[in-house]
């Protein structure tokens, strides 16, 4: 009250209270009904930056394709390397391609922005705005709009969004507007679990207005899962996958390949089987989870330093 009176005395107005669709502080714009993805199961993959989301997403897309599903993977990162192991190359981004035609989308053909990758997986890199400018939500929206205009979602069984780092602003939370389930990639360490906790809070905020629900988490590049499991037990979450820390996964990325294209070594075969199991579980449908994210202080007490 004192602050408001001081502003009025100087002829200034109090700052507005921002309250959007997702609660106080939100300016998230509600998507129009004609932008909804229908007929496909839609997953959004999140996690701490550098945790292996793109590797996980690409191998999961390959696993879905091995189950006979028609898959579309959408990379949502300015690095545009989400589909790198599926296509064996860095694709140009949707935004770069639109710039080349002065944003006249009607001049584009599907082959201009979609590349067919391993085992028929359709790959697209949405990209992102230049550093410090624009909004990732706009990029995702333009990509979905382009796919709808070219009817590329009509015969698709699975759409998988691979989303930039652990950014949980309204823009990079945009894929949650389209997703049925959100999957979090984590590791058995404090920083990864801390990021997962923030992502859970973001998904829970979105679930008030959209259909998205949490499917669970995958412990990636982790020998053990005790810290992940301890966190999940406390907040009411679930680990639904575990990818061990094996060198074969690193080597597959260096060779620009998914694990399904690598030699039949024992550790590779085991990892493939885990991806197939995870794909089967996700496609069959997982129970919607509603964990209660912890306050920062509580995470430190649970997993932090003694």
From Swiss-Prot:
Tell me the GO BP annotations in alphabetical order. Answer: light-independent bacteriochlorophyll biosynthetic process; photosynthesis, dark reaction
Annotated positions binding Mg(2+): 54
Instruction: Name one matching Pfam family.
Output: Fer4_NifH
What is the annotated quaternary arrangement, including any partners?
Homodimer. Protochlorophyllide reductase is composed of three subunits; BchL, BchN and BchB.
Q: How is the cofactor bound?
A: Binds 1 [4Fe-4S] cluster per dimer.
What organism is the protein native to?
Answer: Jannaschia sp. (strain CCS1)
Q: One GO molecular-function annotation for this sequence?
A: 4 iron, 4 sulfur cluster binding
What is the similarity comment for this entry? Belongs to the NifH/BchL/ChlL family.
| Enzyme Commission number | 1.3.7.7
| Cofactors, names only | [4Fe-4S] cluster
Which reaction does this enzyme catalyse, per its entry? chlorophyllide a + oxidized 2[4Fe-4S]-[ferredoxin] + 2 ADP + 2 phosphate = protochlorophyllide a + reduced 2[4Fe-4S]-[ferredoxin] + 2 ATP + 2 H2O
> What is this protein identified as?
Light-independent protochlorophyllide reductase iron-sulfur ATP-binding protein
What pathway is this protein a component of? Porphyrin-containing compound metabolism; bacteriochlorophyll biosynthesis (light-independent)
InterPro entries the UniProt entry points to = NifH/chlL_CS, NifH/frxC, P-loop_NTPase, Protochlorophyllide_ATP-bd
Sites where the protein binds [4Fe-4S] cluster:
135, 169
Keywords, in A-Z order? 4Fe-4S, ATP-binding, Bacteriochlorophyll biosynthesis, Chlorophyll biosynthesis, Iron, Iron-sulfur, Magnesium, Metal-binding, Nucleotide-binding, Oxidoreductase, Photosynthesis
